[in-house]
């Protein structure tokens, strides 16, 4: 039997060629085989001694390692016909390079002798990384942990890398670090960082005798607020008083001098602005104090009040706010401002004019100071307003005299009236508008609309509405009392009208079978409607005065019923609305409710 031979191939490290050789099959033991290979390569061949690994190549050209006796027996079974073992040196570990890196890091960790941080000693502070106590050098305090400190060597070694560390160069640092961390700066809160002064340095250099500035107090007040979605909107509302005082200041010299000496000019009374809403947010429990502050003339504020050198934040456009703030928050904020405006207007009217019985002076010049051209123009406007009031027909004359308020006598563009009841109590209308041209000492002012949600429908009426309403300031006690609105009667009218609509629908369903019955049913319905309104029996002359708004009888009756409830048909908007819903009052009220919510 021929002797078995084992072929070995050695590829050494470096540019030397690989070595191929045959060995007599030494043994079936892997340890003896490995000893024979090392003896041949490193003693007989004089090759550099190193650790080697043995493997063989299978039919798939893959390297199969031979590590123990089991691997060697598998090799003998697989390669019995052609035994070929590959020998290669193990990959050397780069120990010199690692030693060099350790030396460089040791040199970097060793601080310089002249470093001033070596002389800083933090008493009663222990390094949680190496246990150095007291801590010498820079102290690194973890912001997120309750009590975790590192020395500068441990921080350089990147211990505790997952949290934010704060460097403290001295021993007099604050105990609580969280108070000095806030969110992204908005408005005046970012002024502290933009001006570049440190809060620690500011406390050391602050003058105890000096009074803090106005902006600093506002910064502290705003710093207590949490940053949220409406932070930018709240800051805009707090800046509104500073912007409105400069805008209303040029209009004050136009007032009469006598009014300035005797009484203070009520700047906030003619129009309810967002300034009142901002004041009500700041002091909602002190409404009377706000009214007494308004009695002080505002012309002295720019002179006596010191202004800071910091520029005020400009008023943000509402279009930009609508892109930042969600629509539901925006609508809720506008509704809150409207409620505050209405509340403040009622408080001002009742406290200034209702209790004392003396109305506030007008902000517009009187008829004595007007030029002849302006007097002629005002007289023309008053004549046009009186003509406009008399030109609009009324659906129920007796209801206008007893139950319907006087605001319904004129054509109103709003659905439920734009002048509330509280304002009508303190601002009675002049019962004699034709005598306004003769009484030159009578002052005039605009009527306020405290409900900004309603929109004008008729442009012609909006031009006539610019006329001023005369106020009787000479004899306020003789003002007529406002008639009380009878909601019970209006509800009864609505109920009767709904019954009438049901009867009309039932009658129209039977028109194909009994036309004669339909005519009698409509006739009886008309008689019931005439009796339900509660008016006196119509005379032949009175029938001509009743206006016809629509050719359809049911729609025309619906229009008269809604006008009796206080709605206006100016511009035929009520006719178009009831025509679109086939005279159904319930559907018309639903449509108006949806349109009001959208506005």
Swiss-Prot record:
Region annotation (3 X 8 AA repeats of S-A-N-Q-S-X-X-P) ranges: 386-413
Which residues bind Zn(2+) 2 per the record? 142, 145, 160, 163
Looking at the record's lineage, which domain of life comes first? Eukaryota
Q: Where is the PB1 domain?
A: 3-88
> Where are zinc fingers of the kind ZZ-type found along the chain?
122-173
Q: Where is the composition biased (Polar residues)?
A: 305-319, 397-417
Q: Where, subcellularly, is it found?
A: Nucleus; Cytoplasm
- Report what the protein is called: Protein ref(2)P
> Whose protein is this, by species?
Drosophila melanogaster (Fruit fly)
């Amino acid at each position: 039997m021929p002797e078995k031979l084992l072929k070995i191939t050695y590829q050494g490290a470096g540019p030397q060629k690989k070595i191929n050789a045959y060995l007599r099959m030494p043994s079936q033991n892997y340890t003896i085989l490995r000893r024979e290979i090392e003896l041949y390569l490193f003693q007989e061949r004089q090759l550099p001694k190193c650790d080697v690994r043995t493997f063989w190549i299978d039919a798939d050209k893959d390297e199969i390692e031979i590590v123990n006796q089991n691997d060697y027996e598998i090799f003998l079974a697989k390669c019995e016909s052609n035994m070929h073992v590959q020998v290669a040196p193990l990959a050397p570990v780069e120990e010199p390079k690692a030693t060099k890196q350790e030396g460089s890091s040791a040199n970097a960790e060793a601080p310089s002798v002249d470093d001033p941080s070596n002389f800083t000693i933090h008493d009663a502070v222990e390094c949680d990384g190496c246990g150095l106590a007291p801590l010498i050098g820079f102290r690194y305090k973890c912001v997120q942990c309750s009590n975790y400190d590192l020395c500068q060597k441990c921080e350089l070694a990147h211990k505790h890398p997952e949290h934010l560390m704060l460097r403290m160069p001295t021993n007099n640092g604050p105990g609580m670090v969280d108070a000095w961390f806030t969110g992204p700066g908005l408005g005046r809160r970012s002024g502290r960082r933009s001006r570049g002064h440190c809060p620690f340095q500011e406390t050391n250099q602050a003058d105890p005798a000096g009074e803090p500035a106005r902006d600093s107090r506002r910064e502290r007040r705003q710093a207590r607020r949490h940053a949220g979605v409406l932070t930018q909107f709240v800051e805009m509302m707090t800046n509104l008083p500073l912007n409105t005082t400069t805008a209303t200041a040029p209009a004050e010299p136009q007032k009469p001098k006598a009014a300035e000496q005797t009484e203070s000019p009520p700047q906030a009374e003619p129009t309810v602005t967002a300034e009142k809403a901002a004041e009500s947010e700041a002091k909602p429990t002190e409404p009377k104090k706000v009214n007494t502050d308004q009695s002080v003339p505002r012309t002295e504020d720019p002179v006596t009040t010191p202004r800071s050198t910091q520029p005020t934040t400009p008023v943000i456009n509402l279009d930009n706010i609508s892109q930042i703030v969600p629509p539901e928050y925006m609508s809720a904020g506008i509704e809150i401002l409207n409620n505050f405006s209405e509340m403040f207007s009622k408080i001002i009217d009742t406290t200034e004019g209702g209790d004392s019985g003396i109305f506030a002076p007008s902000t517009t010049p009187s008829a004595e100071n007007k030029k002849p051209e302006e007097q002629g123009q005002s007289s023309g406007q008053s004549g046009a307003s009186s003509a406009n009031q008399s030109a609009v027909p009324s659906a129920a004359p007796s209801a206008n005299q007893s139950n319907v308020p006087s605001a319904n006598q004129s054509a109103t563009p709003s659905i439920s009236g734009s002048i509330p009841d509280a304002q009508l109590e303190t601002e009675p209308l002049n019962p004699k508008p034709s005598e306004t041209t003769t009484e030159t000492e009578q002052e005039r002012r605009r009527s306020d609309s405290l409900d900004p949600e309603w929109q004008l429908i008729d442009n012609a009426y909006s031009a006539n509405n610019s006329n001023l309403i005369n106020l009787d300031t000479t004899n306020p006690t003789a003002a007529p009392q406002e008639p009380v609105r009878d909601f019970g009667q209006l509800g009864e009218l609505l109920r009767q009208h709904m019954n009438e609509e049901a009867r009309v629908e039932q009658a129209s369903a039977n028109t194909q079978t009994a036309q004669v019955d339909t005519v009698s049913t409509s006739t009886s319905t008309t008689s019931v409607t005439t009796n339900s309104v509660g008016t006196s029996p119509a005379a032949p002359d009175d029938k001509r005065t009743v206006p016809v708004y629509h050719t359809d009888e049911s729609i025309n009756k619906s229009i008269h019923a809604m006008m009796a409830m206080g709605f206006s048909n100016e511009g035929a908007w009520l006719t178009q609305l009831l025509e679109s819903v086939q005279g159904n009052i319930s559907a018309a009220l639903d449509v108006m409710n949806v349109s009001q919510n959208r506005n």
